[in-house]
Amino acid sequence: MNTTLITGASSGIGEVFARKLAARGRNVLLVARSEEKLVTLCNELGRSNSIRAQYVALDLSKPEAPAQLFAEATKRGLTVDMLINNAGFGSMDDFSKLDLARELNMIDLNIKSLVELTHRFLQPMIARKQGAIINVASTAAFQPVPYMATYAATKAFVLSFSEALWEENRAYGIKVLALCPGVTDTNFFEAARGHKPPARVSQTPEEVVDTALRGLAQGKSHIISGWTNFLMTQSERLAPRSLITRVAGRMMRSQQKDSK
């Protein structure tokens, strides 16, 4: 059974991916930690769209979790022809003040889990010569971000990794896309440190997902969601990195002050 696997699917961008793809008639396998939210969402999607919506409640930051997820999808007889690696989180403060265990946990989820899931599900796609992978990066991938140092570094990895795989797998008929949203109206900032996103530059998750699906259909290696975000990332490539880093630091300090 052809299925789209979506991680971080219980809310935000992941939930919107699930809703929009189910509306297109795609079966979905949703993954997140909250079983209660997954059950509710799967029941709703199945009733509303006449598709098969399944879930696996799992903490993908755990070392054994990606292998467990692959084994479970195989056990259920699912053909995962689209993988959306959306699970991830960030933190916001001076790096020296942040909890080290949480920073390392972020690396496990944002990078290690994403790499393992991509590797495991990519191999069957290559054998079938068909498939698609969307890895959710960020506009933070394009420059250092003081006060979100680890998070931005993980997203820089995701962008570089995804673009390399885009080239490696074109000959197999497999699409790989790095989705780079900017500030989005989700609970990301609250989870990072109780901050609210600045509304003046926020996009909705629906806008971000529409951008991703358009970019995937066009065969792009990466896509930046939002015209303002696109212009910002282009200017960052032209200016000296030291200047960009200082400007980013000022913006983050202002964001921390305004959202307290």
Regions flagged by a language model, labelled:
Residues 24-41:
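Conserved glycine-rich Rossmann-like NAD(P)H-binding loop of the short-chain dehydrogenase/reductase
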Residues 138:
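Residue(s) in the substrate-gating loop at a strand-loop-helix junction
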